[in-house]
Amino acid sequence: MKTIAFIALFIIISVPAVSLAEGPPPLTLEEAVKTALVHNRPLLSEGEKLKASEAGVGEAASAFLPKANVSETFVRSDNPVTVFGSKLNQGNFQASDFAIDKLNSPSPINDFNFRVQVIQPLFNGGKELIGYRRAKLALESAKMTHERARMETAYETVQAYWGVALAGEYIKTAKQAEKSTEKHVNLAQDLYGQGMLLRSEVLLAKVHLADVEEMLIKAENREATAKAALNMILGRPQDTPVTIADSLAYAPFPGSLESLQGEALKDRPDLKGMKYNVENTGEGVRMAQTDYLPDINLIGQYDRDSRDFFGHGGDSYTLMGRLTWNVFDGFLTTNKVREARANRNAASYMYDQMKEGALFEVRKAYNDLQEAKKRMDVESAAVKEGRESLRIITERFGAGMAKSLDVIDADTALTRARTNYAAALYDYNVAEAALRLAIGEKY
């Protein structure tokens, strides 16, 4: 008996643990956003672009440093000048090589030239410094783009999360309608059995029940699709089980339109990023103008020539300074400067347009928020009235004072009011998220 009691106790204790292990814990909105900011694939892509911009700064900085090259060159020739020079370079020139026949018709010679060359830029019109500044500006712009991508990912997560919640509300509404319609069908059948109702009234009630069941099927499919969409944004397999913890609710959003628009102009990272781009195009004008100036480089070179590969022979060094000045290039530089100035002006116009666009986005989201709140108030009252209307008409139907169609109309109106209220509540929460995105609020 003790063994049986122990087994029974073990089963009782274990069953809840097993049931809890069957599915993941409910997902809160905050957890969903945090997950998306870590695993969302488009956001990860933006992160790699940011790394590329960071590498671009290092790439630009390398222009300040010397460049070193090592080479090994093989030449076999019987050209008199080449043979003469190669013998000198190899330190292998003999007095007999001055013989006229050897000078004019020398035997072929092998020459392996090992060379180390170092080039140090001294002045190239400021290309190195301007290129470095442009890379730094591009990095700052990339940081702002990445920050904006984080905000957009958070917004998409909120929208998808509330999409799951809305689908759940639709399922709840459909089940409520199904329950009330089933009661109506049963009542209609009872009245028909008592001879108080026509068969057509019963059939009409059953048709309405079929419509409600179809609505439930669509709502369940909508929920499955919404969960797959949420999983995709979270960077998870689309068939990952999802249970959300938070429900659609109303919370007032503080701030006037004017103050919110001011926040957008001050805080939005995409505007800051575009401002960096405008500065970068200004540097582009200065970069184009550097072609008017000379290039000065210092070159150091070490050579070793021998008859064999990496063999021992004559060696030498060379130091030189090189100045190159393109005094006329067919107006190429002039047109490059014109192009750069046009790009700078275009970026400036785009920056102004982006600011106007940001103000409009705030205005639209703000108006959508106000509209959704008004719809919520209207539909909330409609739900209360619809519920009372259905109760009254159902009682009248049971007393033989109303038709089946009256009950169906009342039930349909209540279902529509419940659906509209859920949609308005969803629109309010999404509009709030859109407003936070529009003003540049960080998550």
Locate predicted features.
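Bacterial Sec-pathway N-terminal export signals of envelope proteins
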Residues: 20-73, 79-80, 121, 238, ...
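Residues on the lipid-exposed face of transmembrane beta-strands in outer-membrane beta-barrel proteins
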Residues: 116-120, 230, 321-325, 424
